[in-house]
Each structure stands twice: as C-alpha cells, then as structure tokens.
Amino acid sequence: MGLFFDSPGSNLYLPCFTLVDAPKLVPLPGVSYKVSFERDSIIHVLSEFKRNNSFKNNHLLDKINTAIAQNEIVVDNSVVNSCKQFHKKYGSDNSNNDAEVQMYIVLLPFEAVNNSVGAASRITAIQVEDDTITITFKSVARVENKQPLLNMQHSLWKSSILEIDDRSELRTWDHKSINKSILSFVKIFYDTDKIIKDFKSKYSLASKRSGDIDSRVLYLSPLANTLFMQLNGSHFNKSWKLLKAYLEQLTVLERNYDTCFELVSMMDLVMSILPMSLKQRLDFLTAKKLKSRAILFSTCVQDFQQIFKKLDDSVDYVNNHFSNSSNNDKSKLIANQLRALRFYIDDIKRNNSSVILKANSEKERTDVTSPNKFLKTSSSHDEDSDSNDEMEQIKSFIDSLEEKNVHPDGIKLLQKDFKRFMKMTPQNADYQVLRNYFDIVMDIPFGKTVNISTIDLAKSRAKLNEDHYGLQSVKRRLVEYLSVLKISEISTNDPNLNTDLHPKKDRASINKPPILLLVGPPGVGKTSIAKSVADVLGRKFQRISLGGIHNEAEIRGHRRTYVGSMCGLIIGALRKAGTMNPLILLDEVDKVLSGGVGGFGNRVNGDPGAALLEVLDPEQNSTFSDHYVGFPVDLSQVLFFCTANDLEGISEPLLNRMELIELPGYTPDEKIMIGSKFLLPKQIKANGLDAIKELPKIYLTDEAWNCVVLEYTREPGVRGLERRIGAIVRGKVVEYVENKMIQGEVDKEHLYKYLGLAHHPISEEILAPTEHSEKFGVVNGLSYNSDGSGSVLLFEVIKIHTDESGATNGPYIKTTGNLGNILEESIKIATSFVKHILFRGLIPGVNEKDINEFLTSEYHLHVPMGAVSKDGPSAGAAISLAILSCALKRPVSPKLCMTGEITLRGKILPIGGIKEKLLGAQFYHMNHVLVPSANLSDVVQAVSTDNQEQYEIYMDRSRQPELQKLKDKTQLQLHYCSDFFDVVKYTWPELLNKEVSHSRPSL
C-alpha cells in the first residue's frame, strides 16, 4: 500500500474525477497542471469538498457554495483521513497553513481506454471567474483505482486506491540492474539534449538570410517549424534547464537505490516536457511495473530522436534533388510551397469572423503570391491543366453511360453530380468528396464482360477432374450450366434454328448463372473448386471473406455523407475484377454476424446477412443498390459461389436463394488418391526438389499411405494430410542437404523420422474390453461430429443397485457423458420401450424373475469422452439395445455398430450423415452396421456418384448390390432395419428363432 501509511492493512479512499474538459491532458506525477473548466462542470466537485467540515475553512474554497454539491456524499471521513496520509508524505513543500486539511483528488485521463490508473493530485490554487474556474493541480503519485467507473463524465465518485510504489519494486533490483538503469537514463537524456541543441542551431542558421543555402530547405519544412516552436518556448527552455541541472547534481552522487529512484521520478518529468503523443503518455501513465515503464520511456524517447534523423534525411534528399534540378523545376517546387501557403491562409480567412483579420489575410495572400510573376503563372497553369484533364475524363465517362448500359437512375444521378462538380472550385468542401466518388464509379466496369470462348464440355470435364478428385455433385451442376451456355451458343450461331421462340432478353434470363452453396467440413476443397470453375469458364476470380462481418455497410457500402465512406465489398470485387461477369466467391457465408446480444447490432449496424439477400437473389440482383454508388448496378451476370461449414449459421431466407451442394468428407481411399496424385507433387514442387534432376522419385508405399491417413490425421478434409506430406518432403530436403543423396521410397517404418509418433489410438482404447467388467450392456452407436466426420459412439450400461422392497416401477437409469436434451429423451423412450416389450413377453426365453430384477434395479448409462457434448436422436436404437442387453444379460458383438432413431412403437426412423457414419465405422474397424431401411437412398449415394448407376442400384431390390459394393470398399457388412426386432434379429440371430410367446406375463 505504500511506505507512509499508518498500518499496512489500512485502506485509502480518494475522490476520482475524469478530465472531460481537458481530453488531451495526461497527468503525470511531479508535474503541476493549470486547468480551466466551465463553471457548471466543476463547481459541484469543489462544493463536495466544502460540504465536509474538515475542508469547510480551507481558504481555497472561500468562493464556493455548498448548495451545489452532489446528492450522494463522496467526501466523507475516509477521504479526509486518506488526504491527511497523502499530505503527510507529499505535503512538505511550504504549505501555508499546516492546520488545514489539503484537498487530494485522483485525476483520470479522458482518452484512456482503461481508467484504473491515474494521478493522485493536490489542489494548490483555485481561481473563480464569471463562467470559468481555473484549478492548479500538483500531481504527486501514480495510483491504481480499485473501483473504476465508466461514463461518469463530470461526476465525482469515491474509490479505494492503491499507490503504485516504485520504491518497493526498486528494492527488488540488484546492484547491477540499478547501475544499468542509471547509465541508460543519463545516456538517453544527454543524447536527447545534444540532438535538440544541434537542431536549434541548424534551424537558427536556416532562418538567417546569410545562412547556408542547403540549410534553407529545413526552414521550409512544416515539421521543422513545429518542432522549433515546441522546443524553443520559454516554458520548455526553463523546464529543460532545471532538469539538466538536477541531473548534474544526481550524477555526482553514489549510484544506489535512492539515486535510481530520483532518476526514475525524472522520467515522468521528461515525458511531460518533451512533445510526446497522447497515446505514448497514456501508455506511460498506465504502466504499473517500473521495469516496463523504463522500457517504454526508452522507446518513446528514441522514437522522438528518430524524428530528427528522418528530418535530416528528408532535407538531404530535397537538397540533392534541388541541386540537380533545372531552374524551371526549382520554380515549380517553390510555387507549390507558395500555393500551399495560400490555401492555408484562405482557410484561416474563412474561419475568421473579424473583418480586420480578413483584410490582413487578403493582404498577406497578395504579398505571398506577388513577388515573382513567373511563379504565379506557372502555378496557375499547372492547376488548370490538372483540373482540365480530370474534367475531360469525367465528361467522357458521363457521355458514354448509355453505351455502358448504366441504369437510367444512375445516368440522371451522375449527370446531376457532374454539373455540380463543374461549378465547384478545388477549395470547396464537397469538391474532393465528389472527386473520390467519380473515381470509384469510373472504376466500375460497366458494359465490360469477359467473352467466353467456344465451350468444349470434354475439355471442361477434363480440367475439373485434373484439378480435383471427387466432388462429382459440383462438377455435374457445372456441366449442366455449361451445357445451357452451349445451347445458347449454338442457337446464336446457327441461322437455321428458330430463335423467335426465345427472344434475346428471354435467352439472357435463361442463361442466368446459378448461385451455388457448397457445404462441407474444412479442407474438402470448397474454395479451390471455385477457382477451378473460374478457370474453366474463363472468368476473373474474386474472393470475399465474410468471416466476422458485422456491419451491413461492408456489404452495401457507406453512405456518402460519412467521412471516409467507401463502396461495399461486392462493388469493390467488380472494380478489382475489371469485368461485370466475374466469379465471386463468398467464403464462410455461415460466419456472417447478424447482430449482437438482443439484436442490438441489427439496430445500430444493420444486418449483413440480410444485405446478402438482394445480392444472392437472381430476381433482384440485376438492380443491386450500393449505398455509396447510389444507383442500381446489374449483378445478374456474376457467378456467385458460397461456402459454409454448417447450415445452422445461415438464415432460412438466405438458404432458400441458393442451390445447396453438400460435400462430404473424403474416404481413406480418396485421401490416399488425392495425396498421391495432387498433394505429394505439389509439396515436392513447393520445396524445390523438382528442380534437382538426379534425385530419385519420392513416393510412399501403400502401408505408409494407410498409416499417414489413418493414424497421423483425423479429419474429414485433407489440410492436415497436406501438412504431414509437407513434413515428409521437408525431411527429404534436409537429408539431401546433409548427405547429397536421398532414398525415394518412404515406407511405414520411416514415418516416425519425419512425423514423430502417431496419435494415440483412442479408437482401440475405447473399444477394448476390460478384465473385470460385464460383457453385456455395451453397444456401439454411430455419430456425426461437428467437424463433418463420423465416429463410433460407445454406450455403456451397468447395474448399480437392486431395490430389496420389490417395487416394480423401475428401472431407474442415471446418465453421464455430457448428454443433450434430445439424447436424454431418447434414453427415456428406450427405457419405456424395453419395459413394454418385456412386459408383453415379446422377447422369448425371459422369465418372470429376470423381468422383476430388471424392474427393481438401478442402472447407470455412460457415454465416454465426457469433454465432448453429445446430442441428437440417432442413438435411440443403440440405447434400446444396450438396456435390453442388460435386462437379458446377453452381450453384443463389439464389431457391431448401429444408428437410427427409435419410437415408442419400436419403429427405426431415418437419420442423416450416413456416409460420414459409415466412414467412422470403417475407421473404428467395425464388421457389421445396422442402419434404418428408410436410409436406402443415402446408402446408394454413399457407394456411387453416378446418377445412372445410382438409379440401377436403387431399383434392384432383389440383389441389393449396394451392400456388396460397400463391403468391397469398406469391409463393412450392412443390414437394413425397419423396426427394433430387426435390430434384435441381426444382433442375436439365435434368440428370435425360438418360439415367441405373445401372452402377457404374470407379474
């Protein structure tokens, strides 16, 4: 708490006040500040002090009325005691009346982001005038505000404070650090002093008529003039001289803690005297640790020194250019300087309401521009020439608007703005606004399109297959679009075809490009397929990342009334592409933010998701309106591709406007094919091995590929696989650099050298049997994970208690494993269903004793990996089988897994993510998979990507060829289940072969 308190545990309370009326002031310890306030904004603060009896007789408050104090009492006895303790340590500077309690207050800078650090200051003088009160504060210590309040404006509040005691921290430093800090401060101070002296000397020489010609450029620099005004004022000279004298006294003393503390205190004085930026002073004030403050001080002063270095470099550069320039170039340079001065004087004249000052400004303007007739003429000629060129360019653009097919509203608006622009002078406030507007509008490529060459479907297919493996659904949709364009091309070029049925405008509407939404897990090729499509179509490609967009103006643009307004991302993409028919990829469309908590963002910034509704609607985007452009722009020729990882983040209206194409994760075989055909050659080229001709070809064996795909990566995409392949190739590069020789083959045993050890085999660990556990009650379900992959989800059920009272209203099931509400409901449904079928005697071989034991027992159901949240209805069949397994005490094969929602009647309903779940079953080495019968079409689509083949498989129900194809690909034997008894039949085939009794058991 500081060394001066009565006891280490005593609390300090001081009133806190934010310097709203002095927003650029940063109070630093050791410095006195004289601040003028408007009477209404500060009078209540002083009245609050006078209301307390301890300050009532303070002579500084003689003219203050207590009736204007705040309703809440801020200055109480705790504040009085704290003021006394502060004055005990810091009030030894000739106080006029030691009997008076001095007023201390914590001053907080207005511009600070964090108002928890301020300066404890003593009020030393108060001057009251009519509408103004001027207060002198003497800042004495840096303190931490323990109870910061925001938006207090001119209000005063009491807070518990903590002195930031530099002396205590200094005691923890060793002698070496003390000595180093002293030497560092002394060097920085004297280096700065020398730089300031040299600058003043150069400037004084440049300001004299008899001075060096080369030094006169320094006198032209606005930076040099500003620095000289700041560093040559009487206040700066006096303060700097005192600091220098005090430093000379300290340097002769012994280098100990006390000397170092005095130098540390001088840092605050130096930061307040030198012309530092507001941010630098704020950072310096709020730095609590002395060591970090010392580093910040060194950085700030060195930055200040660099200003003079850059100033000297700029002067040397101008002198070198000036010495090699012709007289005409020199005249132009001086003319530009004079013209800038004239503009500045004109601004002063406009802002000055005094007639006398206006006349003086006019006289100064005449004197400045009249000495050299040539300079004046040259300046005017250059200005007029530039202005004429601008006008000609804009006029040419305005005249060609109809040819460029600009919307009629746009033609009217641009012509009107151009007329206003022609009447303005460059000094007009709106001149530059309109100039920037015309620059942006002229960049929009109205009427410019990239002509698509003759469409060859075979070459297009080959190009897509060359760039991407799989993704048949995207390729199929693109081929359909190319075929439509091909028909249009044929109908246009063949005079024998009847084009009256489809006039030109109708054909244009038929050829509207599709708006495709590619949904899939990360790394499956959504973004890269869009680039390939642009290459196939011969269109310019532009990518817009929508992640984190939270403002409608970023899509639609800012209105021109705002300072620094710009067009939106869509118009910006057209400007970059230089054509009206590019392919624009809206990446991560599901990450668009749609407002803050409680819809606040929608009210303030607009909804960027809603702004996309017009962009992605083929019926509306022909008249897309950007706020900055101000008139409709035709986007109907743009081919929009959108990507997303999850449909949940996309609103229904937006989703309805796009064609949805789902990209599932890759199978291990597909990953191996992509890795060998695409990724490995790409990494070899990226790491430079392709340039070395004598090297053997690098390849991975089949075992190595399987190991990399199955053990070193766990993802639906191939980004992680590419990183692993890159690590292998870089390892080969290291071997070549060290040995000048490498082996081309990479087998499974060599992988550890490049990739380290494989991931922990969690699949084997979870599914492995335990020594003392029961074999029954364990069933493998299937899950679709949030990253787009599938996996086996284990359900464990054990009996933990039996009710000896014989109550048969159970069983009671406790659940763990971070389960969601829907999964909890599935457990309740499964429990009721198993009770129902046992009660009706639908399972043969179950006696009354087993039923009673089941109904009177308590069970515990757990799903491993509790850190992962789990939810959804698709585990109903697996949970029912696990509970039935416990009731019958029959184990389930650990190589069997299943998925499907169950109803109270035992019906197995269809679920989603079939392909991903089958991949997960393959990854976990399952043999048999049970899926709902209604998922037949999903299974067919998982084993085949060709439409014709899918139809043939789907219609052949007698042979069910999809089962054999799946087994050939994944070694999985799939069974369809219509109801729960199909599940029981495939799980325990021998059980249902017994005679089924339908009589109700007697309980």
Curated annotation (Swiss-Prot):
Residues 367-389 are annotated as: Disordered. The active site is at 874, 917. Residues 14-305 form the Lon N-terminal domain. It comes from the Eukaryota. GO terms for cellular component: peroxisomal matrix. Keywords: ATP-binding, Hydrolase, Nucleotide-binding, Peroxisome, Protease, Serine protease. GO terms for molecular function: ATP binding; ATP hydrolysis activity; ATP-dependent peptidase activity; serine-type endopeptidase activity. It is an enzyme of class 3 (hydrolase). Its EC number is 3.4.21.53. It catalyses: Hydrolysis of proteins in presence of ATP. It is found in: Peroxisome matrix. Residues 773-969 form the Lon proteolytic domain. One of its GO terms (biological process) is protein import into peroxisome matrix. ATP binds at residues 520-527. InterPro entries: AAA+_ATPase (IPR003593), ATPase_AAA_core (IPR003959), Lon_lid (IPR054594), Lon_proteolytic (IPR008269), Lon_Prtase (IPR027065), Lon_prtase_N (IPR003111), Lonp2_euk (IPR027501), P-loop_NTPase (IPR027417). Residues 368-377 have a biased composition (Polar residues). Pfam families: AAA, Lon_C, Lon_lid. ATP-dependent serine protease that mediates the selective degradation of misfolded and unassembled polypeptides in the peroxisomal matrix. Necessary for type 2 peroxisome targeting signal (PTS2)-containing protein processing and facilitates peroxisome matrix protein import. Belongs to the peptidase S16 family. This is Lon protease homolog 2, peroxisomal. It comes from Kluyveromyces lactis (strain ATCC 8585 / CBS 2359 / DSM 70799 / NBRC 1267 / NRRL Y-1140 / WM37).
